[in-house]
């Protein structure tokens, strides 16, 4: 365990929550001058932190605790009937690892995804600068997992490879390929990849009970939720 007590953290001013607009959110950030050390990152992930661009953060809201860190314990996971169908439906997909970079192919896919799936969110409208700042960081543990069929790019899972697991940073995919359930397939693939690498978990970020867009996370069972500084398993 790293000496986390020596790290400095800063809190933002309260602002409107992007998930629950009726709530005021505060975010706790690791000191940006702190080098992005992979072991520090792993230890903070176990405490509910996430990465966005060059920053490690977690919610630190005074009057709300709706954002619950979630992870999938890889060795315990068993796909259900629907998930097995998704795996079978995508058996033709080839996955390869790439270094994070800006390419027109990546951005075009990202742009279609944001415009068709998240036009009501704070990432709309998408821009090249936003894409690069958010996802294209020169970090040794960051990967762009490309999902392709006959060289056609269908999805990119931006994933951090940590000593204790895979952290699913962000996934964007072809919005017209609804039948494939590419977002769910990407998570299933990451679970299998974490198992292959003999890692402990896949970190999914935050689950919010009253946010429809987050409901998919609890469809992967068992799932572990960080509650009162302790990971609790739900079967």
From Swiss-Prot:
Keywords on record: Acyltransferase, Cytoplasm, Transferase
GO CC annotation, single: cytoplasm
Record localization: Cytoplasm
Catalytic activity reported: N-terminal L-glutamyl-[protein] + L-leucyl-tRNA(Leu) = N-terminal L-leucyl-L-glutamyl-[protein] + tRNA(Leu) + H(+); N-terminal L-aspartyl-[protein] + L-leucyl-tRNA(Leu) = N-terminal L-leucyl-L-aspartyl-[protein] + tRNA(Leu) + H(+)
Assigned EC number: 2.3.2.29
A single BP term in Gene Ontology: ubiquitin-dependent protein catabolic process via the N-end rule pathway
Database matches in InterPro entries: Acyl_CoA_acyltransferase, Asp_Glu_LeuTrfase, N-end_Aminoacyl_Trfase, N-end_Aminoacyl_Trfase_C, N-end_Aminoacyl_Trfase_N
Enzyme class: transferase
Molecular-function annotations in GO: arginyl-tRNA--protein transferase activity; leucyl-tRNA--protein transferase activity
Pfam families per UniProt: ATE_C (PF04377), ATE_N (PF04376)
Disulfide pattern: none
Family: Belongs to the R-transferase family. Bpt subfamily.
Function in brief: Functions in the N-end rule pathway of protein degradation where it conjugates Leu from its aminoacyl-tRNA to the N-termini of proteins containing an N-terminal aspartate or glutamate.
Protein name per its UniProtKB record: Aspartate/glutamate leucyltransferase
Organism: Pseudomonas syringae pv. syringae (strain B728a)
